[in-house]
Every structure is written in structure tokens, then in C-alpha cells.
Amino acid sequence: MKLSIVQKADNTPTEQYLLEHPKENAKSWSSDPGAHGWHRYVGRFPAQLVRAICNYFDLSENDLLLDPFCGSGTTLVEARLLGIPAVGIEISPLSAMISRVKSGFNVDTSDIEEYITRLEEFYYEKYEVFLDGKDISEYSYEEIIARDGNSICAFSNYDKWFTKEALLGVSVVVEYIIKIRNNRYISELMATALFAKMRSIGNVDVDVVRAEYRKTPRENVNVLKLVVSHLKKMVKSIKEMKFSHKSTIKEA
């Protein structure tokens, strides 16, 4: 199935087609192009449906689009790409945060890239200071939770949900997110990236809607690598959205 309803107009590729096919003559397309793929969200309707409705009603920068149940922000993202002012309402704090992050990005990614570098430096320092030359296996879960700078509260069965290295890694990333919370967008962007990779970090099956323990714990979990890799994909997609929708996208 092709995602773009219209691929070309007067032999010129449409903006949606460019976003779904960032490379010319690509053999595959993205079902969650741009910011839509930043965080998995069960029950989210296709972005192409929103795009089609906006086009049908000929919405423009002179209109105001309201999504009273915005979820993860699919409608808000499409409105942002099309230059349509939009407002979303969402009761779930997590969903509201994801929608803000997906629709509120700055098209200039230099600030995000700088914070990614700072995250890497912070992570290596905090991780190594805690280990103090020892192996992670020499520490207990309780010692990781009691780590100076940790803000994750003790919870039941954390030894089943996370390996020690994964719990320590998440703890350090969360510490950094809190440290930079004065920059609300960047801190929420990084939190979204962390949450998006949580199924790959924790001892859970990734292919089920309800979280369930894995039969075998994940080994050699590198939280920083997973989070930074996702952040860089987010940066790449911002650049793609800026290019594919340069005629309509506006600053947040």
C-alpha cells in the first residue's frame, strides 16, 4: 500500500511523498514519517488521514485547528508541517508531553545536538564515578537506587524489570533530564527518547501491548547508546521535515 495519496503534482513530488521517501528511488517507505515515529503509541490513527482531512477542508494559516483528544500529537504534527495553527487537549501527562515534543521542535537542531554531546559527557562521568573501578555485578540494586543523584524511587520487582546496568543507565539519564529541566523542550525531548527505548532497555517483550517479563534478561544493555541513537534519529527527521515542508513549516 502506498501512503501518499498523491505522489506528484505537475511532475513535482508532494511534500508528504518526500517525507515518506527521504531518499530518491528508495525501495521502502516509512509508515511513521518525521516526528510521527518518535514514540510508539498504540491506537494512533494514521497521519495520512489527518493530512487528507486538512486538505479536504482547505485549512490554512488563517484557521485554528483544535484536537480535543490529541493523544501523542498526530494532528498537531500535521498542522505544524502544513503551517496551520493548532491546539491540542490531552489528560494523560505522558501523552501530553509526547505531543508537545513531536509538534514543538525547532527547525534549527544545533541546540539539540549540543545537548546530546553534553548528555554523553555527563553519562560517562556519572556512570564511572559510581562504579569506582568495580564491575556492576559487585553492586546491589539497593545501592544503585541509593546512588547520590538518583531520583528513581524503589519499586517492587525492579530486579525483574531491569538488569543492574540498565537501571543505573536509566538513573543517570533521568538525572541529566532533571538537571536541564529549565530548558523544558530539550528535557522533554530526551525524556521522550528514553521512554521510547524503554522496552529495549528493560526486561520486557517488545512485541506485546501489555508489558510482560522476558524469560531471559537482556544482557549488555547500553542505555546511553540506545537513547543517543534515538535522539540522533529525531534530529535527522527534523531536518527531513524542514526540507520536505520548507514552503509551509514555521518555527514553533
Where are the predicted features?
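Nucleic-acid modification enzymes, centered on SAM-dependent nucleic-acid methyltransferases
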Residues: 6-61, 82, 87-252
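Conserved class I S-adenosyl-L-methionine
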Residues: 61-71
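Glycine-rich SAM-binding Motif I of class I
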Residues: 73-77
